[in-house]
From Swiss-Prot:
NCBIfam families: N-Ac-Glu-synth, PRK05279.1. InterPro entries: AceGlu_kinase-like_sf, Acyl_CoA_acyltransferase, Asp/Glu/Uridylate_kinase, GNAT_dom, NAGS_kin, NH2A_AcTrfase. This is Amino-acid acetyltransferase. One of its GO terms (molecular function) is L-glutamate N-acetyltransferase activity. The keyword Amino-acid biosynthesis applies.
């Protein structure tokens, strides 16, 4: 990374550093993630999150390590409804696998980067289990489910600046140990902690569409369709499928955002959390983007967006004072608290006309549909004002507006006030859209 790229990334990440401080994240790590060579980088990034004031709970699984140990001991186990049936001999193997991973996680988190503080990593026995029992005539043996979680205990450990680590085995009130799905543990802890995020590492960079592209944002309703596809194709054991189910449940229970990332790519955790667009798949009941009317609090963001375009001569220069006076005219698209697009609607009621002005989209989003989204929002505002004709003045984007129904016009077609202030030095093209009202 060149110095300029580093500086730019660092500046862009600053709002997210402030946004995430003092927040609580639950991180899900399956056995494949822990066994992967990139795990050392994941733990370094977890340590970085902790140093930024983020409260962390790590819940890990050991499915692949259990399978390896069973094969090594010439043993096997069966599944029913995607849950391992655990007898007493299998449980001993589970304990061995989980214990080894527990040690690996602690040792990795204890490996400090130069000049970084020692991390306070603690193990938690906050989960109390109970047997699954007999379902459909199948005895699950020592496979269990959650009976109770000592959330107060976890909260106390987090308040003491600890990273809390929880594995997939837990005791019952009778002292027996049970094997639990770690995804269930992570999901329920996130829900009961009222965590801000649930983050899952899987073997692909989130959820992919039919063409293999990462879906950056998913509503839980859409996510259910992808989960169904996993199940119908026999891929429920795929880590992405299990994490997707956990994320859907978490979103429905009030967790604002869940993220699915690849454990194979170095830095995926940081890229997902500290950049506008992330790198994996985010599940949320609400979109990370919001289109709304601007307020005075948006003026700094508006200035950051339009200043470069003013300097290039694409937009007419506007002072801060002018923006303050006209702020109610502006519609903005906001992404994670950052203004990425804007447009103003200037009304001329006598002529039943309005101007779409100061149209700006952040460079990172110009190849997307944000311009169309803004135009539709401006048209809706114009309809409410009973505007019959919407016009624009532009020096660079004539063709874009023509493709959307605007027709080239002359100054004679402008409202009287606008015609009197037309800048003949700038010689902007005039385009008008008949709204048909």
């Amino acid at each position: 990374m060149r110095n300029t790229e580093l500086v730019q990334w660092f500046r862009q990440s600053t709002p997210y550093v402030n946004m995430h401080r003092e927040k609580t994240f639950v991180i899900m790590l399956d056995g494949n993630a822990i066994a992967h060579p990139n795990f050392i980088n994941i733990t370094n990034d977890i340590g970085l999150l902790h140093s930024l004031g983020i409260k962390l709970v790590i819940v890990f699984g050991a499915r692949c390590q259990i399978d390896e140990l069973l094969a090594k001991n010439q043993m096997s186990s069966t599944y029913h409804k995607h849950i391992r049936i655990t007898d007493s001999k299998t449980l001993e193997v589970v304990k061995q696998a989980v214990g080894g991973l527990h040690y690996d996680i602690f040792s990795r988190l204890s490996l400090r980067l130069p000049n970084s503080p020692v991390l306070n990593v603690v193990s938690s026995n906050a989960v109390l289990a109970q047997p699954l029992g007999v379902i459909d005539g199948v005895d699950y043996g020592l496979s269990g489910k959650i009976r109770r979680i000592n959330i107060e205990g976890i909260q106390q450990q987090l308040a003491q600046d600890a990273i809390v680590v929880i594995g997939p085995i837990a005791p019952s009130v009778t002292g027996e140990m049970f094997n639990l799905p770690f995804e269930e543990i992570a999901t329920q802890i996130a829900i009961k902690l009222k965590a801000d995020k649930l983050i899952g590492f899987c073997d692909q960079q989130g959820i992919l569409d039919s063409e293999g592209n990462v879906l950056s944002d998913l509503h839980p309703r859409e996510a259910k369709r992808y989960l169904t596809q996993f199940i119908e194709s026999g891929q429920y054991h795929h880590s992405a499928a299990r994490f997707l189910q956990a994320a859907i449940e978490a979103c429905h229970a009030g967790i604002k955002r869940s993220h699915l990332l690849s454990y194979k790519e170095d830095g995926s955790l940081l890229q997902e959390l500290f950049s506008r667009d992330g790198i994996g798949t985010q599940l949320s009941e609400e979109s990370s983007e919001n289109i709304r009317l601007a307020t005075s609090f948006d003026i700094p963001g508006l200035l950051n967006l339009i200043r470069p375009l003013e300097e290039q001569g694409i937009l007419v220069k506007r002072s801060r004072e002018q923006l303050e006076m006209e702020i109610s005219n502006y519609t903005i698209i906001e992404r994670d608290g950052i203004v990425i697009a804007c447009a103003a609607l200037n009304h001329y009621p006598q002529e039943k006309m309005a101007e779409m002005a100061c149209v700006a989209v952040h460079p990172d989003y110009r190849d997307s549909s944000r311009g169309d989204v803004l135009l539709e929002a401006i048209k809706r505002r114009a309809y409410k004002l009973q505007v019959e004709k919407l016009f624009v003045l532009t020096t660079r984007t004539t063709q874009w507006f023509q493709e959307r129904g605007f027709v080239l016009s002359t100054t004679d077609d402008l409202p009287k006030e606008k015609r009197e202030h037309y800048n003949y030095q700038r010689m902007s093209k005039i385009l008008i859209l008949d709204l048909g009202q």
